[in-house]
């Protein structure tokens, strides 16, 4: 699982996913978030600029979750994710935020935006980091099962 973002939402989902047995690759431009993730024993990749993202290798078993509220990071990270094979691509935020995000992606010439889940999570409108993490992980598990059942058929 690849999770990009900053703050409590990033930390909560990364920790929960790790406990659930996922191999987590957390990406953040925020030094404080990076330090929190490292203290939790998570693999952290420090993002320095949205114009020079590290190479990725998302495969059909990878979920990519965006835990940002910043279009300067969202557009390049989602463009990159959409170029890969991740079975799930999702972004935190309200329906209004998702509409703004999709509009920004279209203006940037990004295709296949229908692959982006948003708002993320099985339980709508989660306001705390732990609840959002649980709701998001549940959605990822459901999507993984559905995706791989379709692939096997």
Placement of each model-derived feature along the sequence:
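Hydrophobic/aromatic beta-strand patches that form the interior of the parallel beta-sheet core
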Residues: 25-27, 45, 63-65, 90, ...
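Short phosphate-binding/catalytic loops that engage adenosine nucleotides
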Residues: 22, 86, 110
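Alpha-helix N-cap/loop-to-helix initiation residues
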Residues: 10, 71-74, 98, 125
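ADP-ribose/adenylate-binding Rossmann-like module
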Residues: 63, 68, 79-104
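Adenosine-phosphate binding glycine-rich loop
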Residues: 92-153
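SAM-dependent methyltransferases
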Residues: 1-4, 10-23, 63, 130, ...
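Hydrophobic, well-ordered beta-alpha structural blocks that scaffold small-molecule cofactor pockets
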Residues: 1-59, 73-77
């Amino acid at each position: 699982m690849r999770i990009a973002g900053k703050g409590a939402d990033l930390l909560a989902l990364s920790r929960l996913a790790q406990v659930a047995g996922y191999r987590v690759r957390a990406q953040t431009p925020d030094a404080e978030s990076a330090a929190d993730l490292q203290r939790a024993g998570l693999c952290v990749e420090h993002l320095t600029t949205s114009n020079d993202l590290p190479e990725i290798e998302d495969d059909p078993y990878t979920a990519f979750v965006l835990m940002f509220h910043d279009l300067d990071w969202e557009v390049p990270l989602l463009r990159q994710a959409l170029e890969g094979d991740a079975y799930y691509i999702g972004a935190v935020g309200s329906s209004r935020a998702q509409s703004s995000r999709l509009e920004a992606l279209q203006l940037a010439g990004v295709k296949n935006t229908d692959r982006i889940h948003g708002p993320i999570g099985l339980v709508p409108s989660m306001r705390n980091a732990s609840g959002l993490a649980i709701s998001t992980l549940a959605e990822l598990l459901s999507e993984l099962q559905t995706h791989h059942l379709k692939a096997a058929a």
